[in-house]
A protein has these predicted regions:
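Short, well-ordered coil/turn residues at beta-beta hairpins
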Residues: 35, 89, 202-204, 305
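Hydrophobic Val/Ile/Leu positions in short beta-strands of Rossmann-like dinucleotide-binding domains
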Residues: 147-148, 203, 226
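Glycine-rich beta-strand-centered segment in the early N-terminal region that forms part
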Residues: 22-38, 50-92, 121
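Glycine-rich phosphate-binding loop and adjacent beta-alpha segment
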Residues: 208-269, 305-309
Length: 309
């Protein structure tokens, strides 16, 4: 079996080409992808070649962990999934490319247990479930968010989920293009905020130089949550010591986090409206990646695979 996939042959060298797929196992499903999102965090690092080394890292690779599509075939133990609309959090199914994280392809193979059923009506918004689950995972692991740093799509999801759970976070954003779009919370600049008693600060800016200024805004016993993706980080110890600060790293989401945000959406407590700002055909993947990483007006870029065989 073959598929057509986005392939990063090397940093900043992207192609759309056929790839061979591994054999289908009894517990697998074959998903025909309708939409896949482009991550401006991990995928940007893979695209630019600045991703810190980790086991399994290397090129060529198929990126993507934000795909949605329909189960069109399955192994003998998963026949009941055929016809389901599912969210695909990545796939490692290619014989001649690495799956990091493998979701940006027209057809993918993955274990049935990892393909999460979603409402077909979500359409391209279903590609946001990975980010929504990432935001929920960060919040569920600690104190409610009092301050969120960054009003990109992940920051907006953090804020919306916080409001849905009864919170009232403040949000900082330095780019005037991204200040608009708040519902149920206020967006401001750090220079207009003189608070220095935040119990919890969630950073989704990904900026490596944010720890010192954020620690300075904490109350005693406060927490800074690193919900972005960073290279090397450092901070001055005395201010953190004086505040007895906690620095927590929020890692990848779990299936329970996807289930939680899916329930919030189903109960009309969480809206994904206004977050997918750009949809491009998969055949225009090169231009789509450039726009996703370079255009501040692009909150979320989604590839449409409907015209790819």
């Amino acid at each position: 079996m073959q598929t057509t996939a986005v392939v990063l042959e090397a940093p900043e060298r992207l192609t759309l080409r056929p790839l061979a797929l591994r054999a289908v196992e009894p517990g697998d499903v074959v998903v025909e992808v309708d939409y896949s999102g482009i991550s401006t965090g991990t995928e940007r690092l893979l695209y630019t070649g600045t991703m810190p080394a980790f086991p399994g890292m290397g090129y060529p690779l198929v990126p993507g962990y934000e795909s949605v599509g329909r189960v069109v075939a399955a192994g003998s133990g998963a026949q009941d999934r055929i016809g389901d609309t599912v969210f695909v959090p990545g796939a490692n199914c290619y014989t001649d490319a690495r799956g990091l994280f493998g979701g940006a392809a027209r057809r993918v193979i993955l274990p049935s247990a990892k393909a999460m059923t979603v409402a077909p009506a979500l359409g391209p918004q279903a590609a946001l479930l990975a980010l929504a689950a990432t935001a929920y995972h960060a919040i569920a692991g600690g104190k409610p968010a009092e301050l969120i740093v960054g009003h990109g799509v992940l920051g907006r999801l953090l804020a919306r989920i916080s409001v849905a759970l009864g919170g009232a976070p403040a949000v900082w954003e330095t780019n005037p293009v991204r200040v608009a779009g708040a519902t149920g919370y206020a967006v401001t600049d750090a220079t207009a905020d003189d608070r220095r008693d935040y119990a919890s600060i969630y950073d989704v800016s990904g900026a490596a130089d944010m720890l010192d200024p954020l620690i300075a805004r904490l109350a005693k016993g406060g927490e800074v949550v690193l919900a972005g993706f960073y290279d090397r980080l450092s901070f001055g110890f005395p201010p953190a010591f004086m505040r007895e600060a906690t620095i927590r790293v929020a890692a990848e989401f779990k299936p329970a986090d996807v289930a939680a945000v899916t329930a919030l959406i189903a109960d009309d407590r969480l809206s994904l409206d206004g977050l997918v700002t750009h949809v491009r055909p998969a055949a225009a993947a090169n231009d789509a990646y450039v726009t996703a990483f370079g255009d501040a007006d692009c909150l979320k870029m989604v590839l449409d695979w409907s015209d790819v065989t």
